[in-house]
């Protein structure tokens, strides 16, 4: 059954996961605007032309997908406590022992998985809605303002899987 309820930023939740057997997780809070975005482009395209007229299209190389979100800045690091979001994505401080989700093929980089859950059952849907992004290389930038903001940027080297459960 399709949903009749439009979802809003109040319905979403982001969870970051490492690659251990029982993943170390961080539920993202203080997201501010709730501006999580992702793109799911599959491959480059080669346009086949015949003297300036499009006559076909072929798949080329896979593309690196992307995602991003912002959080209100509370701290850069917290090595003695619960850790910060920067600690999680950079594998530092409290999260220095985290394991990459990339395996040997991505051994030079620490990758994480990201789960975006949108509440559905509270609105009569048959389940909650999920987008799972795997093998994400995360980076961040900081912007001072009202409030200060940490922007998280993700390069998705794995898959983006959409589901309802």
Which residue ranges define each predicted feature?
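Signature of extracytoplasmic/envelope-associated structural regions
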Residues: 1-165
């Amino acid at each position: 059954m399709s949903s009749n309820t439009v979802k809003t930023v109040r319905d979403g939740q982001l969870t970051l996961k490492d690659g251990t057997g029982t993943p170390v997780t961080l539920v993202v809070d203080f997201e501010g605007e709730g501006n999580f975005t992702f793109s799911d482009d599959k491959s480059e395209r080669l346009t086949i032309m015949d003297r300036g007229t499009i006559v076909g299209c072929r798949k080329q190389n896979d593309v690196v997908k992307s995602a991003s979100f912002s959080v209100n800045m509370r701290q850069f690091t917290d090595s003695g406590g619960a850790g910060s979001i920067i600690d999680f994505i950079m594998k530092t401080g409290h999260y220095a022992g985290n394991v990459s989700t990339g395996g040997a093929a991505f051994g030079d980089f620490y990758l994480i998985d990201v789960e975006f859950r949108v509440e559905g059952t509270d609105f009569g849907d048959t389940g909650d809605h999920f987008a799972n992004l795997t093998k994400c290389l995360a980076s961040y930038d900081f912007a001072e303002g009202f409030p200060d903001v940490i922007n998280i940027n993700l390069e998705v080297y794995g898959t983006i899987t959409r589901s309802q459960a």
